[in-house]
């Protein structure tokens, strides 16, 4: 159900917004979830992916493979990961494009801007959890299973 009357649910308009998005908008759209370890450490679910992050592929042909992000190709909505390549007919090797939603970030490349973003997102999430008051940890759930 739509809660905000100013947000469209038109398929045509959403597709147009997606495919004509600027590079800065694509950065946010091309976010990847964090691994469970990082999620518990930072209290943040996902982050915009960037070069030099270490990721693990969780869907598709290359499932289970890990590597460092070599390039974020925003125009094609894909990322290139080291050692994920294929050989062309003429013998040259090229990177295979992987969608950012099909990977989990296992190690973040942190600088001051990224640290401030993590703190800001964690602060907002903590405020929402406090307001809601129904946040369960994985330990709470496992205690109830037995």
Curated annotation (Swiss-Prot):
GO terms assigned for molecular function: mRNA binding; structural constituent of ribosome
A Gene Ontology BP annotation from the UniProt entry: translation
Compositionally skewed regions (Basic and acidic residues) per UniProt: 121-138
Ranges of compositional bias, category Basic residues: 9-18
GO-annotated cellular components: cytosol; cytosolic large ribosomal subunit; cytosolic ribosome; nucleolus; nucleus; plant-type vacuole
Residue span of region Disordered: 1-26, 121-146
Family matches, as InterPro entries: KOW, Rib_uL2_dom2, Ribosomal_uL24_CS, Ribosomal_uL24_euk/arc, Ribosomal_uL24_KOW, Translation_prot_SH3-like_sf
Keyword Ribosomal protein applies: yes
Keywords linked to the UniProt accession: Ribonucleoprotein, Ribosomal protein
SMART domains: KOW (SM00739)
Similarity field: Belongs to the universal ribosomal protein uL24 family.
The protein's name: Large ribosomal subunit protein uL24z
Gene: RPL26A
